[in-house]
Design a protein with these regions (language model features):
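Surface-exposed beta-strand/loop patches in extracellular or lumenal glycoproteins
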Residues: 129-138, 742-760
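Beta-strand/loop-rich accessory regions of lumenal/periplasmic or secreted enzymes
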Residues: 30-264
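Surface-exposed loop/edge segments in extracytoplasmic proteins
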Residues: 32, 769-774
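C-terminal beta-strand-rich structural cap/linker in extracellular carbohydrate-active enzymes
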Residues: 693, 774-800
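Short beta-strand segments and strand-loop junctions that repeat across beta-rich extracellular domains
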Residues: 6-36, 41-52, 469-473, 580, ...
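Solvent-exposed beta-hairpin/edge-strand motifs
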Residues: 138-151, 754-770
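Glycine-centered tight beta-turn/hairpin loop motif at sheet-sheet or coil-to-beta transitions
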Residues: 5-7, 95-99, 769
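Glycan-recognition and catalytic cores of secretory/periplasmic carbohydrate-active enzymes
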Residues: 114, 163-171, 177, 185, ...
Length: 800
């Protein structure tokens, strides 16, 4: 059989009753094998204990102690079908566990192969899994080192500790497995269109892969019994890996198990085919989910909390009043916003702690608090927020290095710690923490001009320290002793978390100049491109410490992947953006978009229907050995995505930014949700890694975006604050906007506008009603206020 489009071809051949299935792509003008599977592609694993029998009308099989080979499906027949102009190739298989029909059709428009598998079991509980297992045609190489591996690119949401591990639907943030060798790219994406909570409870979708050396890599998609390691705990060795289980998948009597998936097969730039996967997931799933979830920022603890302004009241008054402590220190009026974490990780510390670290960054929280105080004219708030800045400026400095955590002692004294013991080493200065704190010190120059000279001095000392300590290849060691020596072997020669230092150096140069600082930032950026990107070794503290500890030399030989965490990616995406803004070098924008796209693989493209009480669309997970949803790093990347949109006009960036912003509020009061992928195991870490983190992003983004955002440079419009834009048109001097607001949201909304021609005048219509005529200059400067009476409702169910 053969199916063919302009860029994709599907072939089946039969030799002595054995099926060979091949998917080919047009590559360099020639047809090249992308997937080639010998034997029937569908495979089933028997459940160890089966019930039923002839009394239920099923064929009795007796003892199901069958080997995998004995459970294989034999080819029964192949057929071509044509209906309404669409050709479908069908293959029929039969085996002791049941019968299967596979349907393949090619989509010329999307350049995708759609596959549907229907399996009728011989008995209702005789399988532990049913899946299609497809082999990547290019042969793998031998693993050599961190630069050269079996394939040019491999990606899955989770990696393995044991061969039986897989990727369950609980980890489907971006449900895809991808391979690339040279320009040959292949990916499998499960079809989630029918995957509601009822379907997933009965038929647990899963993905799997294997990448053996000097052989053929494979990926699979189907129904797989399994889940979180039952021995896994946050502190345990099993966190978070997902083994297959022996539990049978129960099918209704004479029932049929159905699952579908898409294959993305194409010629792509080397190591960049993943970007097709990223965009496909959003186009196919994420965009639709965003349009259907107008109130994702509504929190189940209080349904009235939906407007970002309502959240601001909760955060900046109630929560900050609870968590703020003022204290005198070194002749300054200082303050802290407690995270209540340090007493758990550093013996002798109190719960009155101030964190200046990559997660609980009090300086960032206080910055957003001060922004709120300034825009509302509340001077008391602004002064209290400035107390957090004063504490950092008063911290003990050592050749430019400074500590990350303070503890307010019970006698009123202050004790500083260079790092915590949860994800660092208490007595050593940590580069990533200092870089992130330094970046936020620089932001405070905009709000606190009277302290700007002191801020600049502290930041210059830190910048000089980084320049001095930088390795020849651009990497900056992670940890330094009190004598400012990089003695710790871990992360000394290689790490990706130095991206935070690159961000700080680029921002310092952008504000204050200094060729040495630009050169150092670019040197670190080049290191990330040359040494990290080839095999995506995004090594940072979370990948090996924190709640998923593992040896620093851990390598997953089953999938040929390294541990990686997205915090280093988030800092890198931001750093490359600032480098471009500071120097105008298009290369940094190009590489920054590449890294930004890669981070999007850890963003949820759907509201998982089995996650209870919380919307998950837009939320970020952390790494490939953890499982949380809606972790607050999504608040960091939301601002960066908005900035990339404003530079590029890529609508996906803005939609993802809005989804990420909303997800931070859905997670309240936790630092993330469903920590191990499944429901439960949630933690509260305080305002600095929680609702405050989200509200700071809102304070940064809403002055740009308003409740609705229109960009006339790109002729695009977006709903932001519990609003959905249904359509937008720019016709000569008229702007037509169709929008709806969530139930419970105010009707008087602000539209922010960018890119209007300042010499033009525009007539604005909202839901068919004229809103007035405005000059382009007026729209750019202050936008306009409109009334949106139309109400939109959620189109998705969130389980209680």
């Amino acid at each position: 059989m053969e199916l063919k489009t302009a860029k994709l071809r599907y072939l089946t051949t039969e030799t002595d009753g054995v099926l060979t299935e091949t998917f080919q792509i047009l590559c360099g003008g020639e047809w090249i094998d992308a997937l080639r599977t010998e034997g029937f592609p569908t495979v089933a694993a028997p459940a160890p204990s089966a019930e039923g029998g002839s009394k239920d009308g099923w064929e009795a099989l007796g003892d199901l102690n069958l080997s995998k080979e004995e459970c294989a499906f034999e080819l029964k027949k192949t057929e071509m079908h044509r209906r309404r102009g669409v050709e479908t190739a069908q293959t029929y298989g039969i085996g002791p566990l049941g019968e299967v029909i596979r349907e393949v059709r090619l989509d010329e428009t999307e350049n995708v192969a759609h596959v549907r598998v229907s399996f009728v079991p011989s008995r209702h509980d005789n399988i532990g899994s049913i899946e299609d297992k497809l082999f990547f045609a290019p042969k793998t190489r031998k693993h050599i080192d961190g630069m050269n591996g079996p394939l040019d690119f491999i990606w899955s949401q989770q990696i393995k500790r044991e061969e039986s591990n897989y990727v369950p639907h609980w980890c489907f943030k971006s449900p895809i497995v991808m391979f690339q060798q040279g320009s040959v790219f292949a990916a499998v994406v499960p079809d989630l269109s029918a995957a509601d909570h009822v379907y997933l409870e009965e038929f647990p979708l899963g993905l799997d892969l294997g990448v053996p050396e000097e052989d053929y890599a494979w990926f699979s998609c189907g129904i797989i019994s399994g889940g979180l390691d039952p021995h896994s705990e946050v502190h345990g060795e099993g966190h978070s890996y997902y083994p297959r289980f022996d539990k049978p998948i129960r099918c209704e009597r004479k029932g049929c198990v159905v699952f579908s998936y898409d294959l993305l097969l194409s010629e792509e730039p080397v190591r960049q085919g993943f970007r097709r996967g990223v965009h496909y997931l959003w186009d196919r799933i994420g965009h639709q989910q965003l349009m259907q979830s107008i109130d994702n920022q509504r929190n189940p603890l209080d349904a009235s909390l939906i407007d970002f302004e309502d959240w601001a009241e909760l955060v900046w008054y109630d929560t900050c009043d609870r968590d703020y402590t003022a204290f005198p220190y070194e002749g300054r009026d200082c303050g802290l916003l407690t995270s209540r974490r340090v007493m758990d990780t550093i013996p002798g510390a109190t719960e009155m702690d101030g964190w200046y670290q990559i997660w609980a960054q009090s300086l960032r929280t206080a910055y957003g608090w001060a922004m709120f105080g300034i825009r509302t004219g509340d001077r008391e708030i602004t002064e209290r927020a400035k107390g957090v800045l004063n504490a950092v400026l008063a911290s003990p400095r050592n050749g430019g290095a400074f500590p990350a955590i303070l503890s307010l002692d019970r006698d009123g004294g202050v004790t500083w710690f260079n790092d915590d013991t949860w994800a660092g080493f208490r007595d050593e200065y940590h580069t990533v923490n200092m870089g992130w704190t330094g970046y936020w010190l620089l932001q405070w120059e905009d709000l606190c001009s009277e302290l700007a000279p002191e801020i600049e001095q502290m930041c210059r000392e830190l910048a000089d320290f980084f320049v001095k300590q930088q390795n020849e290849d651009g990497c900056i060691p992670a940890w330094f002793t009190q004598e400012l020596k990089a003695e710790r072997e871990e992360f000394r020669e290689f790490n990706a978390e130095c991206s935070a230092a690159a961000l700080f150096l680029a921002e310092y140069y952008r504000r204050h100049g200094g060729d040495a600082y630009l050169k150092s930032a670019e040197k670190t950026a080049a290191f990330l491109v040359e040494k990290v990107l080839p095999r995506n070794r995004w090594y940072d503290l979370e990948a090996f410490l924190s709640c998923s500890p593992k040896p620093f030399d851990f390598y997953d030989s089953f999938t040929a992947q390294y541990p990686q965490c997205n915090m280093a990616q988030v800092f890198a995406a931001h750093a490359f953006l600032v480098l471009y803004q500071a120097g105008g070098n298009e290369m940094w924008l190009k590489e920054g978009m590449r890294i930004t796209d890669y981070t999007l693989l850890t963003q949820s493209v759907w509201n998982h229907p089995l996650i209870r009480k919380r919307a998950t669309l837009g939320g970020y997970t952390t790494q490939n050995t953890d499982g949380e949803w809606c972790d607050h790093r999504q608040d960091y990347i939301a601002v960066t995505l908005m900035d990339y949109y404003r530079l590029t006009g890529c609508a996906e960036y803005m939609e993802r930014a809005i989804a990420a912003l909303r997800a931070g509020f859905a997670a309240y009061p936790y630092e993330n949700f469903a920590h191990c992928g499944e429901n439960g195991m949630n933690y509260i870490s305080g305002i600095n890694w929680g609702i405050g983190t989200a509200q700071v992003s809102a304070e940064q983004m809403l002055p740009v975006l308003g409740d609705l955002y229109v960009n006339l440079s790109y002729d695009q419009a977006f709903g932001v604050n519990a609003v959905t834009v249904l359509s937008f048109a720019h016709c000569q001097d008229a702007l037509y906007l169709e929008a709806e607001a969530a139930e419970g949201m105010r009707r008087n909304l602000h539209v922010s506008v960018e890119g209007a021609n300042e010499q033009s005048r525009y007539r604005v219509f909202v839901n068919g009603t004229g809103a007035g005529t405005f000059s382009g200059e007026e729209l750019n400067r202050k936008g306009l206020d409109v009334v949106v009476e139309r109400t939109g409702t959620r189109k998705q169910i969130i389980l209680p």
